[in-house]
Regions:
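Transmembrane alpha-helical cores of Major Facilitator Superfamily
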Residues: 19-27, 54, 82, 113-121, ...
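Helix-to-loop junctions at the C-terminal end of transmembrane segments
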Residues: 31-48, 134-135
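A late C-terminal transmembrane helix in Major Facilitator Superfamily
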Residues: 102, 106-136
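Helix-terminus/helix-capping segments at the ends of transmembrane helices and short amphipathic helices
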Residues: 2, 96-104
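Short amphipathic helix-loop junctions that connect adjacent transmembrane helices
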Residues: 1-17
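Hydrophobic/small/kink-forming positions within alpha-helical transmembrane segments
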Residues: 30-31, 61, 124-125
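Multi-pass alpha-helical transporter architecture, strongest
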Residues: 142-171
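C-terminal transmembrane helical hairpin of 12-TM major facilitator-type secondary transporters
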Residues: 47-95
Length: 171
């Protein structure tokens, strides 16, 4: 978002970046989280697991769009970031709720803490590697790689559904 167009970025000023990431993005993330929590509360995690997994992956295409068209309109950039963050917030609720549901029982607080640590690690490790990868391949190729790596989310969703069904069968 900050890199200049000559480097494949959008060239946002610090003020524009603050507005897009710090205000619009946070609002989208919060809205997505609220909608995700309400969805699970009313329909259960099994019903919403696939839509939430897809909401984590499909909005990544907004960054691919931005890398191809390099819009200079702050409204378009803000809208793309907002949509991606709503999807992320909505989908991330499934991640949190799955861990909470999976660790019930004896020593559940210790297991929940460990689960949250792995959750943080699953975010930090790719984030640490992403800057290096983006510099090596450029923004467009990087976002194509991000979309292709979404297959891992689909595989994790399948495994989560299998785990939930197995846990229900034991009850």
């Amino acid at each position: 978002l900050i890199d200049g167009a000559h480097r494949g970025g959008l060239g946002l000023s610090p003020q524009e970046y603050g507005l897009v990431a710090g205000t619009i993005g946070v609002a989208g993330l919060s809205l997505g989280g609220i909608l995700g929590a309400k969805a699970i509360a009313h329909g259960g995690i099994k019903r919403w697991l696939w839509p939430m997994a897809l909401s984590l992956t499909i909005p990544n295409a907004t960054y691919l769009y931005l890398s191809y068209y390099l819009p200079d309109n702050i409204f378009i950039v803000g809208l793309c970031v907002f949509l991606e963050q709503v999807g992320y917030g909505f989908g991330f609720v499934a991640y949190i709720m799955f861990i909470k549901r999976f660790v019930m029982g004896y020593l559940h607080k210790a297991h929940l803490t460990l689960g949250k640590a792995f959750m943080a690690l699953s975010i930090m490790l790719p984030a640490m590697f992403s800057g290096f990868l983006q510099q090596a391949v450029g923004y467009r190729t990087f976002f194509i790689i991000v979309l292709c790596s979404s297959v891992a989310t689909i595989i994790a969703t399948i495994l989560a559904i299998i785990t939930l069904k197995a846990k229900e069968a034991r009850k």
